[in-house]
Swiss-Prot record:
Family (UniProt): Belongs to the FKBP-type PPIase family.
Annotated segments matching region IF-chaperone: 76-120
GO (cellular component) term, any one: cytosol
Binding-site residues, Ni(2+): 172-173, 192, 198
Organism listed in the record: Vibrio cholerae serotype O1 (strain ATCC 39315 / El Tor Inaba N16961)
Domain notes: The N-terminal region consists of two globular folded domains that contain prolyl isomerase and chaperone activities. The C-terminal region binds nickel ions.
EC numbers on record: 5.2.1.8
The entry's keywords: Chaperone, Cytoplasm, Isomerase, Metal-binding, Nickel, Rotamase
Name of the protein in question: FKBP-type peptidyl-prolyl cis-trans isomerase SlyD
GO molecular function, one term: metal ion binding
Subcellular location(s) of the protein: Cytoplasm
Length: 201
């Protein structure tokens, strides 16, 4: 079976960024599963997977415009530290959900300067070319429920879980890893495929 819309593919992959650092991976024994054709992957990778079959192996470099976009300086802002209510000590690397006119977006603290904090709303891989080494482990037809919900229904795959205490903003895949932000929602903004799900951007 070929990878096409409404199929579920299982992938073993390694993701490296421009300096050669490995930022995410999954193995043949614990592959990443995702529903194809439902925006569960970054555009460039999903396009490369179209038509592949189990056993296919390839390496591809995805440009920023087909991954997480270029780094947008408009998403870097200096804000008063007191907007972070209920946090005893602000530190570089902390992540939060910020309420915006476009809805909540994840931001990361990149600088703490006295009573002011610099936050960055860019994805951590924005502006990066991403190189994937991929093996297609398996391909199957999606179930009706999976197609209706737009994601797979098994542990370890890409998509949303249904407990709404979590926010998903993963790397390549939706983000099934859960860190903690300070608004009561777990989130991961990981590499391409956070904790078992390669995902939407």
């Amino acid at each position: 079976m070929k990878i096409e819309k409404n199929t579920v593919a299982s992938l073993a992959y390694q993701l490296t960024i421009e300096d050669g650092v490995v930022v995410d991976q999954s193995t043949v024994d614990a592959p990443l599963d995702y529903l194809h054709g439902h925006n569960n992957l970054i555009t460039g990778l999903e396009r490369e997977l179209e038509g592949k079959v189990a056993g296919d192996k390839f390496t591809v470099t995805i440009a920023p415009e087909d991954a997480y976009g270029e780094h947008n300086e408009d998403l870097v802002q200096r804000v008063p530290a007191d907007v972070f209510q209920g946090v005893d000590e602000l530190e570089v690397g902390m992540r939060f959900l910020a309420d915006t006119d476009q809805g909540p977006i994840p931001v990361e603290i990149t600088e703490v300067d006295g009573d002011e904090v610099v936050v960055d709303g860019n994805h951590m891989l924005a502006g990066q070319s991403l190189t994937f080494t991929v093996e297609v482990v398996a391909v199957r037809a999606a179930t009706e429920d999976e197609i209706a919900h737009g994601h797979i229904h098994q542990a370890g795959g890409c998509g949303h879980d249904h407990d709404h205490d979590h926010d998903h903003e993963g790397g390549c895949c939706g983000g099934e890893g859960h860190g903690h932000d300070h608004h009561g929602h777990g989130k991961k903004e990981g590499g391409c495929c956070g904790g078992g799900g390669c995902g939407s951007h």
